[in-house]
Amino acid sequence: MTVGRAESPELVAVLAGRRIAVLTGAGISTDSGIPDYRGPESPPSNPMTIRQFTGDPAFRQRYWARNHVGWRHMDDTLPNAGHRALAALEDAAVVTGVITQNVDLLHTKAGSRNVIDLHGSYARVICLGCGDTTSRAALAERLEALNPGFIERTEAIGGLAVAPDADAVVAETASFRYVDCARCAGMLKPDIVYFGESVPKDVVAAAYRLIDESDTLLVAGSSLTVFSGYRFVRHAAARGIPIAIVNRGDTRGDHLATVKVDGGCSELLALLADELSPLPTH
């Protein structure tokens, strides 16, 4: 059943009185100013693959130059009404937790406590050699020391576009100097699951567990194009629990949905926060 965006009684009816596991994608963050790779109005985008990153020093140089600018914009981004609604529903014991395909940390910023960052976080960096992790802010200090004035020169041009993985469009990257791991001189990479990488098994297991402990699955702002998210819809369907999808445009999981609402996440999640009654916490 598909209902128009202005109607939501069916959505509320499917979710009312149930403990809800939530799966979110890029569509929930567009109202915070972060673009969607695959939304119906998104421009063509070619996200980086892990093979490109590890196999080509020039590609890494270009990537780190762009990320050096882009991560700050991601860090300054604020959650929107959709993120805040899910945090409020968790406080009301309605939402059991959020599985997010986003790396923007906006659920955590909004106050959600049980968040599974399926694809990692823009705010951490990991060494592919020794596995050491550090904050992106600490790496920024090292990069700034090697590239004084780079950010100012880039932002002076104006019209900066930042992708969902904190990759900014920067024209001049050939002079940028990047660094290796301070501990072992290994290759550093943002702690983000890139195209061609697998989500860590323990993270996948935690997401399955969250769905198993819930009475229904709500998908918000994901086209479910990649299997890393779609598998959880299949898992919920195999368990026989209701599935509700809120998204602008079609999704890969529409045929499995109990109810699908074509509309924006901010408005519809805020509506759910108003309509769904708190549940007992025992």
From Swiss-Prot:
InterPro entries noted in UniProt: DHS-like_NAD/FAD-binding_dom, NAD-dep_sirtuin_deacylases, Sirtuin, Sirtuin_cat_small_dom_sf, Sirtuin_class_II, Ssirtuin_cat_dom
Pfam family, one: SIR2
GO molecular function: histone deacetylase activity, NAD-dependent; NAD+ binding; zinc ion binding
Subcellular location: Cytoplasm
Active site residues of this protein: 119
Cofactor: record remark: Binds 1 zinc ion per subunit.
Enzyme Commission numbers on file: 2.3.1.286
Domain of life: Bacteria
Alphabetical UniProt keywords: Cytoplasm, Metal-binding, NAD, Transferase, Zinc
Family statement: Belongs to the sirtuin family. Class II subfamily.
HAMAP family: Sirtuin_ClassII
Protein name: NAD-dependent protein deacetylase 1
Species annotation: Mycobacterium avium (strain 104)
